[in-house]
């Protein structure tokens, strides 16, 4: 059973938790993280989701994403998700939060990392990840057009690639890394 911390609209923890999969109440929010790992030659490590996954099954996606569990900080969740899904150990110093997107019932923190990784040595989490590969922005946008990548707005892919080399933004209320 996975528990999530519940936040208010200003991203303050409420002191309450909820079980994953339960409906969220109005005014309740949870924390999600996405991590984009880039190679030194500017390609993003992307993953293909398992065909039996709920939501976007069998489609390609950015490197890693997942929900923060109760007690996690954003950066803890980011490091844990990368370790669990693709077997890469990252220190907090390697993770750089580049932006936060508010969505219906949550906050989605995006991190970028530049790290050359030998994909043949990765330990993929069977429950989540089918395979991984390196791809540039044009290849990812072509995959979106082909319907084999999660249908992000293509300009958002450009933003992710832009942020790999530039400092991102954070909310005024969130000054922690």
Describe the residue ranges of each PLM region.
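Acidic, metal-coordinating catalytic segment for phosphate/diphosphate chemistry
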Residues: 1-34, 40
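A residue-level structural signature of the nucleotidyltransferase/glycosyltransferase Rossmann-like core
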Residues: 4, 43-44, 132-133
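Short loop segments at secondary-structure junctions
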Residues: 10, 39-42, 50, 114-119, ...
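A short, polar/proline- and glycine-enriched secondary-structure boundary/capping micro-motif
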Residues: 25-27, 55-59, 133
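A glycine-rich, hydrophobic loop/mini-helix early in the fold
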Residues: 32-64
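The catalytic Nudix box helix
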Residues: 45-46, 63-96
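Nudix hydrolase/Nudix homology domain
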Residues: 58, 70, 97, 102-106, ...
């Amino acid at each position: 059973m996975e528990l999530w911390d519940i936040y208010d609209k200003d991203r303050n923890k409420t002191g309450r938790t909820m079980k994953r999969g339960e409906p969220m109440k109005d005014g309740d929010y949870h924390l999600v993280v996405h991590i984009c790992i880039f190679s030194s030659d500017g390609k993003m490590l992307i993953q293909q989701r398992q065909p039996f996954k709920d939501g976007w099954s069998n489609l390609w996606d950015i490197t890693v994403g997942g929900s923060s569990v109760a007690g996690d900080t954003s950066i803890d969740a980011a490091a844990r998700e990368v370790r669990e899904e693709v077997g890469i150990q990252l220190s907090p110093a390697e993770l750089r939060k580049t932006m936060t997107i508010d969505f219906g019932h949550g906050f989605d923190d995006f991190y970028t990392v530049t790290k050359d990784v030998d994909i043949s040595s990765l330990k993929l989490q069977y429950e989540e990840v089918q395979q991984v590969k390196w791809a540039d922005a044009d290849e990812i946008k072509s995959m979106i057009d082909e319907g084999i990548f999660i249908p992000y707005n293509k300009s958002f892919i450009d933003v992710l690639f832009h942020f790999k080399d530039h400092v991102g933004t954070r909310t005024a209320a969130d000054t922690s890394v």
